[in-house]
Each structure stands twice: as structure tokens, then as C-alpha cells.
Amino acid sequence: MVYSYSEKKRIRKDFGKRQKVLDIPYLLSIQLDSFKKFTDQDPTGERGFEAAFRSVFPIKSFSGNSELQYVSYKLGEPVFDVKECQIRGITYSAPLRVKLRMVLYDREAAPGTVKDIKEQEVYMGDIPLMTDNGTFVINGTERVIVSQLHRSPGVFFDHDRGKTHSSGKVLYNARIIPYRGSWLDFEFDPKDALFVRIDRRRKLAASIILRALDYSTQDILDLFFDRVNFKIKQDSLVMDLVADRLRGETASYDIKDAEGTVLVEKGRRITARHIRQLEKTNTTELEVPVEYIAGKISGQDYIDPDTGEVLVSANAEIGLEDLAKLSLAGIKEVSTLYINELDNGAYISDTLRIDSTTNRLEALVEIYRMMRPGEPPTKDAAEALFNNLFFSEERYDLSKVGRMKFNRRLSIDDDEGTGILSKEDIVAVMKNIIAIRNGLDEVDDIDHLGNRRIRSVGEMAENQFRVGLVRVERAVRERLSLGDLNELMPQDLINAKPISAAVKEFFGSSQLSQFMDQNNPLSEVTHKRRISALGPGGLTRERAGFEVRDVHPTHYGRLCPIETPEGPNIGLINSLSTFARTNNYGFLETPYRKVIDGVVTDEVDYLSAIEEGRYVIAQAIVELDENNRMMDELIACRHKGDSTFMGAADIQYMDVSPQQIISVAASLIPFLEHDDANRALMGANMQRQAVPTLKADKPLVGTGIERTLAVDSGVVVAAKRGGYVDYVDASRIVVKVDEAELTPGEAGIDIYNLTKYTRSNQNTCINQRPCCSVGDPVVRGDVLADGPSTDLGDLALGQNMRIAFMPWNGYNFEDSILISERVAQEDRFTTIHIQELSCIARDTKLGSEEITADIPNVGESALSKLDESGIVYIGAEVKGGDILVGKVTPKGETQLTPEEKLLRAIFGEKASDVKDSSLRVPNSVKGTIIDVQVFTRDGVDKDKRAVEIEEMHIAQAKKDLTEEFQILEDGVLGRARNLLLGAGFDEAQLDAIPRSQLLMQTIDDEAKQTELEQLAEQAEELKADFDKKFEVKRRKITQGDDLAPGVLKIVKVYLAVKRTIQPGDKMAGRHGNKGVISKICPVEDMPYDEKGNPVDIVLNPLGVPSRMNIGQVLEVHMGAAAKGIGNRITEMLEEQRELAELRGYIKEVYELGDEVQQRVDIDSFTDDEVLRLAKNLKGGVPTATPAFDGAKEKEIKQMLALAGLPTSGQLTLCDGRTGNEFERQVTVGYMYMLKLNHLVDDKMHARSTGSYSLVTQQPLGGKAQFGGQRFGEMEVWALEAYGAAYTLQEMLTVKSDDVNGRTQMYKNIVDGNHQMQPGMPESFNVLLKEIRSLGINIELDQK
């Protein structure tokens, strides 16, 4: 494999054995592609804005004299960029402008004669835009729209699993689900009649809907039944014989062939052998006794030719008397419905008998009454309602997906079709459910991923936009019918508010629009790849059963079987598998390699769950020879959802990679194959909660996906084009682009500005640091700067810690963790958290609130950290209770006593008419102010601090743009200089020419002169561009802010808090091995090895066997080897050994392993590259053991041997306190530990006195309210059982809701008198009031 310059800085040793056929696709494509389809112009009009506009327009007036037509749309440019929107707290969006055409028709002339046409561009609201990383900025916060897994439109057949009826009889049902519109259900009742429901309302006989579709009783019978024809003879009947129909019946008479030979005796069951005999003798007619027809059902009306009287009506039972009547009337032939118990039930016939309607109108009225109970039906209303239900394109849409699923399920060849239902569709569904009831077809599996599809952000936004458009449509139609249209323009007809409101509601408050989980890069990526079955149109937690939540065979390679939340949402929220993607219909598909005659090709096909069922698919772990031919005779494979063994020749596809079944988070767990799934689930979920540490540390034992994830998450800065690094500082990287990648006429400079110390959604710190040096060559995709939780482009969520598995004085009881003081001293798990605190000055009824340093009754020391505007300085160290922003609020006027009036006259007005409402630091918070932002309403005077901040921002913007301009100008001048050097000028001449004159030189060579003139033009453009950019920036900074109504000023203060690790913090490994720190132990007391090196963390060995996550033990062994090799390399460097020896050792490390795919050609590295690689490997050789394809025990032992460590992975340790050796050897190695975002500082809380609930007078609950601990029912029982009467009295009175008692208690404590006088708790008064509210008077007699 060829490595770039930056990749050679540190290479991860990969133990993967399988050939990589397919790179992991871009991880955020599900979000970006979906939204791109929504916003991109689509000439076909099948999706996005175009589809929404075409579905609603043209809007015609009620009279038909005018209409509003849609022409085209344009999405403008956003006013503010993403960062500005986040700072200002506004939505990152772009204006949507639509060109509409208003057409007026001439009433007097022929229909369709145009009188006037007006075209105009109309503003239709702002549409939130997606950022490059797949998020939306709504009101200043980053949000993610989670994709939804919902039931695909189409037709589904199911049954109730015998739960509806007490007999346990299975009742079948069918449901037609459209994309928009009414649901249509068909269902059997226990008596086997077929019923229909519309939108889950009251059920009607299914034949009613057929009558409403204009089918008569005769038509219905013809549609659903075959006929049996009888010829009437003197004393018998002759039946037309279809031999197959007799199978399974019991002969009620002797069955004879044409010659009179008895084939089946009376009373015998007719078998397949008898049928074959009948067919052999070509028997087409059979003489049967007259009694045979009794009870059979007539297939048509029989009318007396003379009188016109109906002798036997269709669907009526024929008796012997009826037969006599027919014979008398001269009717020679009778046809009955072919019905048998086995596979041809009389379901529709029974249904027709229940049905009280006889014609179309009655059926329509019946449907109208069911849909609109209480309204008097009219013919037109009933007809309109029925048509609008399923046959109107405005109200009903199956969608392309729905039509495709519908047609495939009912075996209709064409996948295309209309979005509305037809008569034939409804009949086909009824025929199919009857076939299922007859045992001729199967019900569907609704949890199959072929029946569930993904609705992504673009589709949901389009639906919401359409909802807004429909609201506008109603208003437009009314306006077109009223008023003088000659004077109106399209602008006057359209009100953009309903559209904006619908879109805003979706992005702001939909259940699927979620506050982005921004703990670390992994949590961001996972959130964007999440698939939820909840949300509008989906399931609810309470209703979802076990089947929906369970892992289904079709999840393979599509949804991760491991990563899902624990708790009520388990199985309802899933994660997309690593290689999965959605197809055009929204179904999930996964890639497979094609196999032809046992030979695996490199051709990759993406298959959906439906397609996959048709093929035989082998796993990725199949052994292949050098020609990619399968070596085993029998191969484990999957077919139609079952696992089986088949020969190599039968295999049609093979998995692309062993990791394709799991999600990104699960594939970050090394040795995943050795962990129990429950613990792996916890491991995958806890990695998302890891807080970025101060100094990121790459995992020594990884899986090889770390770099892909870090780059795709967007937290690192990756090179857009190749070149070399020209300039680096903490906030900017400049890359000079290679000539080969330049587009003609550009400066050839790429500038990357880095994000510095900004706050994430979870209050963690986002900071980017350059990881390249000036002069480094870069290629496209190389990592130039690390973000949070990344180290040299690798995802680094935690720290590599030296672990020992042993008990230590009970401090690791029940998963507790003992850590060394050294870990805290070295700041290994120190994290920075940034809090945003806001102070809002409002306009109140009594006057405006004011931000000022002049605060009543506050001492000088409390104001020491504020400037003259009353806002805290940047860099100030603050603690709980300190004032950050001084604010005073006007107080209501009260009647003053003469004494107060005198005091006011002496000391001035100020003190009494305002109260202090300053922003203070929350209790138990201590940190440093790192930034202050002031937002002032338009028209309100800016204070001194606001002006200073503004000037600072302008100066910073000017500096940035000037530097950017100079870099680009230097690039242009550098190319001009090279051009002049090639045209006869020498260095000395060029040095003498001033910079400004360099581009004005003349050259004899015409081509070069033209090029020089082009460069001069370019320099001019750059200057003009710089001036324009600066003016835009300046205007944005100085303009007033658009604040909420009534808000005059907002001050945002950013506080950085440094959190070191301490007892009570939660830590975890990657295998679900979590615990809480019990003690930070001095280094000298920690167990140490024979060389005197102490361990960092002691874990309880009992945490491994019962939890079955053995992966952690293998990780510790591999980590020990990786670190040991790093120590050997460090020794070589310190002893300044020969470079050849170092190169040889490193080569030996990378070549270890028999079937390993990775090949690192260390011989091709230069001496400098080898030295740089060795320096980066001093901390340990990072290794990769991919899931299901990782390092074997033998390879771990080889690595340990190479590191000079015992191959058992165990060492003899000594007790740090006594110096004595422990009895047995201990497993010691390196494990990657994470510090989770459950910090003791956020949870620890104590209360003495504080606020009380107004009604109950009991202390509030929770840390946020500075509340107390609940002393509940069971705790009272405990004190009662113990007999601690006085403690109990104290708990129930002065410590709870005895108002007078607690006031007295406070005074007593102040006076040093430690006694209490309990009174009556307030809860008695509450009880009194509750009883009185029931109308019962109850009073307390106080004696």
C-alpha cells in the first residue's frame, strides 16, 4: 500500500486478513444526499420543491375565470454563514423565491381565451439549509433530523394470530396504505364474512364497496366464483365435471365413468388417484341424484319466461322445491357457485347476504353515513366523498413506492402506474385475501425490511413544505374569487407565513428534529446515521411489541444488531450499518460481491431486502485461494432468511466485509467477536458519551476505522487539494496548491481557518490544532489539523492506561475503579467544559431593565471583575455567586413612610426604585471567562463594552482578510516573478522593482505578456473582492441585532471550566466495562512491576467472567505488546543505535502475522521518514484488529515476544505499601479508557435552606432548583422500624413543611440553642383544603 507523507507519520499495524474490496462509503451521505435531492432543481418534477409546487399548482378560482400557475423557483444565498448564525442565535437559511404566472380568462369570449397574463417573482419564506456536515442551525443551535423507518406504502396481508376471538380462530386482514390519504382495510370476522373499514372506522360489509364501484350482485359473483353447471333431467341431474374440484370431498353417490363402471363408491373420500382415473377415462359429465343440488347456491337470477317472476335469485340457496319450479318453467340448465370447505370458501356469498344495500346509490349513502355520522346524505355529497377517498389525485397518493409494492405483491408485471386506486386494484386485493383465507397464499411479514422504508430529511422537509403550500392554496383560491383581479399581482395573492410556519414547526419542534449529540465526533456521526421507528406516522413506545423491536434476518448489513438504546426505546431506534445505503425507493440496501461458478469477482452489487431473498449469499470469512476460488466444499450461507450449507457452485453472492453487519460505533470495538452482545451494546453506546480530553491519545488497540470516522465527521481539517504547507499558526493553515490541480486563472492558494475554543451542544470544548509543519507535502484528503478527540487524524476518545486486573483492598468492589494519582497529575483525563450564561435586559411595564455597574446594595469587591458597562472582563477567574453582568430592574412604587422619604432625600432616588437582578455564576461552578458577546436591539444605544467588542471584531476581520489577501497576492506575485525570470529578468532586477510595479512590466514574448496581464487582472479582482468582503463583514458586525419582542439587549458570557478526574466520575472501557472511581491512590501505594513501574488503574477481575466480555482481556494483552514495542523503539532512539537496526525492528513489527493483508514497505522510506515514524511510535505501535477479522491468539503472543514481554501477558507485581510481591502473577497491560459525560461535579449537590413549594411548603427537588432530598414513604418506615422517633419527628416537621418550626429552628441555631419545637406541618392544611374542595367542611379545633 502506498502511504502519503502525512500518513507515514504514524502507521497503524493492521491485523485484517480479508482483502478490502470496497472502501467504507461517506458516512454522512444519508443526510447530505437526501437534502440535496430536496433542494436541487429536478426537471422531471418527481421530488423536491419541484414536486411540491407541481402537486399544488396551478390553482384555479372557483369560477374558472382565473388561475395561478407555477413557472420556476430559485433558492437565494444565506445572509449569514453558519458560524455567524450560531453566535447570533438565528437560523441558517436561504430565501425561496418562486416565479408565478397569473392568467385571467375572458368570460365573454370562447372558453380558454386568455385576457391577461402577469408574471412575478414571489418570496415564499426562508428554508433552513443543511451545513456541510449534515446538520441544521436552528435558532443558533445545531440540530439533526433523524431518518425514520416507517411502514412502506402498498398493500399488506396479515392476521391477528388468534388473539381477537375467544375461540383462537385466525382472522385474516388486508390493508392498503397510501403515502397520503385514507387507509382501506379488509378483514374477516369469525363467521368468515368479509368486511371493509375506511380509516379504521366502523366496519361495513365488503360488498358495499364493490356496489359503490358499480358492480351488481351478478358481477360480484362472476368476479369471485367459478360455476358448476347442471342439466335438469327427469329424475336426476347431469353435472359438467371438472375432476380436480372433487378432490378431498366425500362421495355422496356412486361415481361412474361413461361405461357405467363404479370408480368411487358412495361414502368414500375422493383422492388424487380417483381424479387421475376420471381424467384417464375422459369423463366430462356425471349423473348425480336430484338431492345433490339441495343447499347449493344459485349463480344467477332465474326468471319465469311467462310471468317475469324471479324463481330463484342470484346467491340464493336452491332447494328441491326451487328445482321443481325451474323444471316446470321449462328451464333446462342451472348453474351454481363452486364452493368447497377446503380451498374455495363461500366468503363473498355470505357477505352479500349480510349486505342490506342493493344498488350503487344505497352503497354510497351507507359509506357517507359511516364517514360523516349525523350529516344528512345527498347523492352528490355521497358521490363526491367516495371519489375523494381513493380516486382523487389531490387527496390520495400511493406514491411510486406504494404503486411498485402494490403491483409486486399482487403479481402485476408493471412497476409503474397511477397514484390512485382503480376498481381492479380493490378487486385484486379482495381476491388475494380470499386466496390467503383459502390457504393458497401466505401473509406478509411486516417486520421484513422490504416492507419498511426509510424516510430521510429531504422527503420529510418536502412533505412539510407541501403542507404549507396546501394551506396557502386555500387562501389563494378564495382571493382569486374575490376582489378585482385586474389590479392584483401574484405577490398580493400569496402569503408566505403558512409556509414558513410549517417548515419552522418541522425543523424546530418535530419529534425527529433533535438537538445534536455533540459530545465527541463519534456521537455526531452516530446521531446523523440513526434510524428511528418513532415520530409522526411511526410507532409509539407503548404500542410497539416485541416483534417490531427484535433483530430480523433482513437487518443483516442494513441495520446494526448491536447498537440500540437500553430502556423503553430498545429496538425502536437503530443505527445504520457501516456499508448500508438507501435506494431510490427508500429501502435499505447492502453491498455484496458477485460469485460466478465458485469464483468470487470484484464486482459489487447493492441488494435490497426483497432482492436478497432470491439469492444464496456466503459470508465474508469464506476461505479463498489465490484465484479467488472458494476452497471449501460446503459453505455456510444465507438463503431466504435461513442459514444453511451449500456447495460452492450454488453460491451467487458473498459479503463485502466482515464489518458490514455492524454500525460505525460497534466497529470501533476491538475484539468485538469475543464480547457478549449485551456488553457490546453498552460499549457502543458509552463511546458516544466520552468527553474529549485535554490532550487526545490515539488508541493503541483500534480497529482501523478510526481515521475514516474522524475525517467523515468533519471535526478535522482535511486538505481539499494537494500541494505543500506554506504557512501554519494556531488559527490558520495555508496550502500552496500543486500546479496539476489548479484551475486556470486562480491564485492557487487554499486557506483553512481553524475553530478555536468554541462550545459544543453538550458544553464540551471544540478546538482545532494544526498537525502539519511548514514545507510538508500534502495530498487531497490528508489531515492538516486535529479537532476534538482526534490525534494525528485518528479518532481518540480516551486515553491508553496501564491496567492491572486484581482486587485491591475492596476499592474495586462492584465495578469500582482505583486510579493512580499520577493520572490526575498528568492531566490525562482533564477536560474543558464551556458554559454559556445569558443575561437579557427587557422592556418591562415599569420601565426598561438596565445593564450597569451601578447596582444597589452591592459591595465594591463584588464589582471588582466588572468593567464600567457592568460586564465581566475576559480572563477573569470567577467562582459561584460572583456577578458576571450587572443588571437592575425597576421596582413597583410603594407608599413611603416619612422616615424613608427623608432617607431618599439624603441618599438619592436610585437605591429604592430598582432591584438587583444581575447574572451570577451558578453555585459550585468555578472557571475563567473566555468570551463575551453583546447583542443590542436596533435603535437602542450601544454601551461602551458593545462598541469595544464591535471594534475588536472589525479589527480581527480586517486582519484576517488582509492576511488572506496578502497570501493570495503573494501567490499571484510569485507566479509573475517566475514568469519574468523565464523572460530574461534576473533576481537582482526583480528585487529592485517595487511590489506594486511587478505586474506592470512588459515582455517581448507575446504569450508571456498575455499571461502577465491576466495575473494583473487577477490581482485587481483580488483587491476588489477584498474590499467587498470587508464591507460586507463590517456591515454585518455593526448592524443592530434582530432580538425577540421586548428584548433590548442580550449579553452572553462564556465560562471555561477545567474538570480534573475525581472520585465519583464515571469511566468505561470499550467493551461495556463501566465503573465509578472509588479512590485516587498515591503513586507510591500503587502496585508496581519488577522494573519499578507502577500501574495506572486497578480493575476488578470478577467483572470479566460473568459478563462474558473477554475482548477487554485480549485488548489488554495486545495493548501491553504495542506499548512494549514502543518502549523498545524508545530505548533504541535514546541509545542512538544504528538506523539500519531501527529500520529492521520496525519492519519486523509491520511484517508480523501470516495472512495479514497490510503490507508496509519500510525499505522505501527515507531515513528522515523512518526517524519521524519511530518518534511517533515511542508511545506504542497503534494496532488495528477489525471486528470479526482481528488478531489471533498466536499473533498476540508473537507481538508480546517481539516486545520482550512474557507471552502469558502476566507479570509479577509488588504491593506499593509493603514492597512484598503478590502471591500470583497479575494480568497487566494497556486498555483504552474513556471518561464519560456523567461527572460528579454536575451531580453533587447539598442544601441547607432554600426555596419552598408554594402549596405544600416543602423544599423543592433537584439540583437545578437547589432542592432537597425526598424523604419518602419507605424511608419513614425504616425510621419507624428502627424506633428513631425524634429523628422521624424532625424529618416530618422542621426539615419538611412546618413553617413556623423551621423559622424558629433557624433562630435557635444562630443563638447557639440546639433545640427544636415542632409545630403542625403545612401538609395538614393542604389536606383540609382538599377535603373542603370535595364539599365537606372540616375545621381544626385548636385547644
Curated annotation (Swiss-Prot):
Assigned GO CC terms: DNA-directed RNA polymerase complex
Keywords in alphabetical order: DNA-directed RNA polymerase, Nucleotidyltransferase, Transcription, Transferase
EC number(s) stated in the UniProt entry for this protein: 2.7.7.6
One Gene Ontology biological process: DNA-templated transcription
Gene3D superfamilies from the UniProt entry: 2.40.50.100, 2.40.50.150, 3.90.1100.10, DNA-directed RNA polymerase, beta subunit, external 1 domain (2.30.150.10), DNA-directed RNA polymerase, subunit 2, domain 6 (2.40.270.10), RNA polymerase alpha subunit dimerisation domain (3.90.1800.10), RNA polymerase Rpb2, domain 2 (3.90.1110.10)
Catalytically driven reaction(s): RNA(n) + a ribonucleoside 5'-triphosphate = RNA(n+1) + diphosphate
Transmembrane stretches, start-end: none
PROSITE patterns, alphabetized: RNA_POL_BETA
NCBIfam families cross-referenced by the UniProt entry: PRK00405.1 (NF001616), rpoB (TIGR02013)
Function: DNA-dependent RNA polymerase catalyzes the transcription of DNA into RNA using the four ribonucleoside triphosphates as substrates.
Membership in a protein family: Belongs to the RNA polymerase beta chain family.
Subunit comment: The RNAP catalytic core consists of 2 alpha, 1 beta, 1 beta' and 1 omega subunit. When a sigma factor is associated with the core the holoenzyme is formed, which can initiate transcription.
Record-given protein name: DNA-directed RNA polymerase subunit beta
UniProt source species: Shewanella piezotolerans (strain WP3 / JCM 13877)
